[in-house]
């Protein structure tokens, strides 16, 4: 693709982009107008408060309830992991809703603006879900609560990557949503998909690289069974994706990296739910037998 085909500044394209910019400018100008400014600022501060302090308060409350009502063991650790992940998703979702309310309370956004806001809010929830999953599985602050058999050194080394992946997806996903709203050219859509594929592949690549370096540095044993195959499969998948990018097959690379991302999210979610459910059944069976 040439620069002109990737960024086709035709009259129609410029008109759509300008209209969206006008819509965004209208919403923000209304939100910070003298009569609405304090409400917007209060919603912005409330969103930050919920995101930072609210998550800790909710997480602490859920942890206290879990410790109080569930017996020690894998069931408690499963519930604690779910509580940590749930607290992250709920608080970030509420913060995004408050920010949207502060922006749109005193204005009537256009259809394109409403579509963009809806898509961005969904994207925020998905990115928050990724961050919550990472925190729930790694449990850096509470190693004794960790469900997977992950050494502390590896958990600490991999800790920043769920947040990094969530932030990267938020930035690139925003561009994808804008392209969708303004109905941009196919060439630009494919180019953004290629950038998404490159970003996701690099995050997974550096996470895998840090995993191997940490394992060698601390002479840690490799995982056994099916879990031991995960680094190899992920590495091969990333390699194929990067080769597709280098070969110019952007759509194929995008397909592979999106599948890798979704399989990782689904597998991690299923692991948490199955661990919690199976342990709940085991504890229930033991209680029935004791009676």
Region locations from a protein language model:
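Hydrophobic/aromatic interaction determinants used to assemble and anchor large protein complexes
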Residues: 26, 30-285, 291
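Low-complexity, acidic polar-rich segments
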Residues: 6-30, 231-234
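Generic intrinsically disordered, low-complexity segments enriched for polar/acidic and small residues
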Residues: 1-4, 18, 208, 215
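Short, small-residue-biased leader/transition segments that mark boundaries at the very start
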Residues: 1-12, 284-287
């Amino acid at each position: 693709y040439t620069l002109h085909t990737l960024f086709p500044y035709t009259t129609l394209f410029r008109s759509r982009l300008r209209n969206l910019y006008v819509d965004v400018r209208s919403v923000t100008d209304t939100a910070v107008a003298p009569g609405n400014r304090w409400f917007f600022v209060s919603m912005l501060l409330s969103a930050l408060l919920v995101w930072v302090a609210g998550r800790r308060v909710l997480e602490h409350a859920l942890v206290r309830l879990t410790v109080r009502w569930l017996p020690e063991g894998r069931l408690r650790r499963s519930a604690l992991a779910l509580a940590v992940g749930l607290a992250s998703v709920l608080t970030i979702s509420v913060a995004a809703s408050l920010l949207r309310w502060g922006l749109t309370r005193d204005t009537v956004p256009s259809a394109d603006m409403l579509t963009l806001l809806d898509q961005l809010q969904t994207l925020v929830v998905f990115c928050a879900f990724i961050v919550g999953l990472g925190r729930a599985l790694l449990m850096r602050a509470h190693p004794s609560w960790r469900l997977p058999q992950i050494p502390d050194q590896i958990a600490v080394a991999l800790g920043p990557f769920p947040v990094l992946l969530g932030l990267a997806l938020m930035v690139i996903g925003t561009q994808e949503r804008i392209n969708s709203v303004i109905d941009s050219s196919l060439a630009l859509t494919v180019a953004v998909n290629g950038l998404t594929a490159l970003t996701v592949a690099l995050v997974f690549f550096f996470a895998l690289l840090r995993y191997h370096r940490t394992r060698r540095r601390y002479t840690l044993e490799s995982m056994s069974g099916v879990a031991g195959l995960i680094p190899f499969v992920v590495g091969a998948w990333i390699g194929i994706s990067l080769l597709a990018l280098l070969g110019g097959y952007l759509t194929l690379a995008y397909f592979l990296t999106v599948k890798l991302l979704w399989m990782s999210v689904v597998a991690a979610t299923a692991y948490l739910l199955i661990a919690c459910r199976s342990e709940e059944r085991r504890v229930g069976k033991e209680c029935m037998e004791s009676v």
